[in-house]
Swiss-Prot record:
UniProt keyword list: ATP-binding, Cell inner membrane, Cell membrane, Lipid transport, Membrane, Nucleotide-binding, Translocase, Transmembrane, Transmembrane helix, Transport
Protein name, as recorded: ATP-dependent lipid A-core flippase
Domain ABC transmembrane type-1: 67-349
ABC transporter domain mapped to chain residues: 382-618
Mitochondrion in keyword set: no
Assembly mode: Homodimer.
Length: 623
């Protein structure tokens, strides 16, 4: 396996020749960076209050369903103390035969109360699930909207696992725990208040003993809150790391097999898996310790209640029915109190998940300060004026004072060694990368003055790494037109891309699904499908980013023929690795270390015997 994976923390790269453990060092560095970035601010009270406000402002948008659910929970809560109250007449009068109608009335009352509680609980749970799922849909919609608007640089960080976890796990935890908190807080609080009322009515002296122990239980719960918050935050981080490691194992399975990377990948996975287990056990330990400690406090109170009750019974101040009713109410109060004390853990998990979700929602979208649209008709003139760019932490400019003009309909090829700045330069045109200096003009209009929608609507891209969506061939081709297009246009585009014959041979023709990552298509077929998509868009400026570099000779020939049709009448910027594909360009610009060192037609550059000639001759010797 490789000694260093791009996009991981700096500590992962071996310094001074030191070899690191690929199953431990990078993951450890990544986890510690995640933890450091996420720890301190989240624990502050203002941040917690802001998270609460943001979560429940979204829940409050569905206040009608919420209010109805609360009323139903109140109805369910009212049945519990009533069941306890029934114990007194049942024992004092029912068994003595003093009131014969109790023989049928009390059993029916018990059944009716339990039935009422079941109905109220069902509909309140349904309404809360309705609220939760609507809020979840809204939050995920906000997250996806922000995801689509993030700058291109944000996607270069390689934190795919963390992003996926935010959508699949964190967003669900926010709404799930938020409604759980409402359910427990409302339902169990009402039950506790009602039962305490019954207890006070039965015997205020016995009730005071119970009330003395409640603050102790609350204090224990608060003591565990901060620890649970930290543990849950680390668990979220480790879940993201686990997702990333598994995702890399799936995507890189061929490399793992060919380079015998089984042991390295097992070590990477075992490290994350074991660390996740440790945090899960810490969380489970804290949760498990909270309940028995609370129960010990309650049991002390129960022991004191029994002692005082026996004393009152001996003096005739307390009947058997009253004591049984009191104990029934007391027995019912334990579970609600337990659920209320456990609420701290759910609150912390909700806040950790909310922090993760809103971190994405609050990220700054790509700058779109332009207000102009390209004047019609769009000609396709492109000019770079002294454009420079340096990536953060780089020791030199990736692109340095580059200037050139591409007239409408011209084809200009950018060539040079790897790292010479070709891709960075071209990525500035659609504003995926922003220049640090200089200007880029599209039809004599500075691109920063244009809206992103106007600018990008007049650009098409065909790259080496073709992105196709898990949909039909027709849908992928029609994507270039921004939506559904008629079958005739799709077929025309496929024909121009030399792909129609293949597509017609499929059982469903143009309506055949391409599968995830277009796994059912070959590399050449994917490229030609991307060309058909660009043909449908019919933009005046075309960017070709090493579109044929990964193809075999036959596929390259077919794709090259399709590209020639696509390039006709369009301004084209070509990034080429195979110099044989750019010989017919109107002009070739040779870059080295971010600067233009040569430019001109193919024949002139060969005759000049400079860098271009050196690269060209080197390739043909290799061929």
């Amino acid at each position: 396996m490789l000694a260093w994976r791009p996009g991981r923390p700096d500590g992962c790269q071996a310094a001074g020749g030191r070899r690191y453990n690929p199953g431990h060092d990078c993951i450890k560095a990544s986890v510690s960076l995640n933890s450091a970035a996420r720890n301190a601010p989240a624990g502050s009270q203002p941040v917690k209050a802001e998270l609460w406000k943001r979560v429940y402002s979204r829940v409050g948008s569905y206040w009608k369903g919420l209010v109805l659910a609360v009323l139903l929970m109140a109805g369910a809560a009212a049945t519990q103390p009533t069941l306890a109250v029934i114990m007194k007449p049942l024992l004092d009068d029912g068994f003595s035969g003093a009131k014969p109608h109790y023989v049928w009335f009390l059993p029916l009352a018990v059944v009716g109360l339990i039935l009422l509680r079941g109905i109220c609980n069902f509909f309140s749970d349904y309404l809360l699930a309705w609220v939760a799922n609507n809020v979840l849909r809204g939050i995920r919609g906000e997250m996806f909207e922000r995801l689509l608007g993030l700058p291109d640089a944000d996607f270069k960080r390689g934190d795919t696992g963390r992003l996926l976890n935010r959508f699949t796990i964190d967003a669900g935890n926010v709404t799930g725990y938020a409604t759980d908190v409402i359910t427990v807080l409302v339902r169990e609080t009402l039950v506790v208040i009602a039962l305490i009322g019954v207890l006070l009515y039965m015997s205020w002296a016995l009730t005071l003993i119970i009330l003395v122990m409640l603050p102790v239980s609350v204090g224990i719960a608060r003591a565990f809150t901060r620890r649970l918050r930290r543990i849950n935050r680390e668990t979220v981080n480790m879940n993201a790391e686990l997702t990333r490691v598994v995702s890399e194992g799936i995507d890189g399975q061929r490399v793992i097999k060919l380079f015998d990377g089984y042991d390295a990948e097992r070590r990477r996975f075992d490290f994350v898996n074991s660390r996740l287990r440790r945090f899960a056990m810490r969380s489970a330990t804290a949760d498990a310790a909270l309940t028995p400690l609370t129960q010990v406090c309650i049991s002390v109170a129960v022991g004191a209640v029994i002692a005082v009750a026996l004393s009152q019974a001996n003096s005739g101040a307390l009947t058997v029915g009253s004591f049984a009713s009191f104990m029934a109410a007391l027995a019912q109060i334990f579970d609600p109190i337990k659920r209320l004390t456990n609420l701290a853990g759910k609150m912390q998990k909700m806040l950790v998940a909310a922090e993760s979700v809103f971190t994405l929602v609050d990220q700054t979208p790509e700058a779109d300060a332009g207000t102009r649209a390209l004047p019609e008709p769009v000609r396709g003139k492109v000019e770079f004026r002294a454009v420079s760019h340096r990536f953060p932490d780089a020791d030199r400019d990736t692109v340095s004072a580059v200037s050139f003009l591409v007239e409408p309909g011209q084809t200009v090829a950018l060539v040079g060694r790897s790292g010479s700045g070709k891709t960075t330069l071209v990525n500035m045109l659609p504003r995926f990368v922003l220049p640090d200096g200089g200007d880029i003009l599209f039809d004599d209009v500075p691109i920063q003055d244009l809206t992103l929608r106007s600018l990008r609507s007049h650009l098409s891209l065909v790259s080496q790494d073709v992105v196709l969506f898990d949909d039909t061939i027709a849908a992928n081709v029609g994507y270039g037109a921004g939506g559904t297009v008629d079958d005739a246009r799709v077929r025309d585009a496929l024909a121009a891309a030399n792909l129609l014959e293949f597509v017609d041979g499929l059982p469903l023709g143009i309506h055949t699904p391409v599968g995830q990552n277009a796994a059912r298509l070959s590399g050449g077929q994917r490229q030609r499908l991307a060309i058909a998509r660009a043909l449908i868009k019919n933009a005046p400026v075309l960017i070709l980013d090493e579109a044929t570099s990964a193809l075999d000779n036959e596929s390259e020939r077919q794709v090259q023929a399709s590209l020639e049709r696509l390039m006709r009448g369009r301004t084209t910027l070509v990034i080429a690795h195979r110099l044989s594909t750019v010989q017919n360009a109107d002009r070739i610009i040779v870059l080295d270390a971010g600067k233009i060192v040569e430019h001109g037609p193919h024949s002139e550059l060969l005759a000049a015997n400079g860098l271009y000639a050196s690269l060209y001759n080197m390739q043909f010797r290799e061929d």
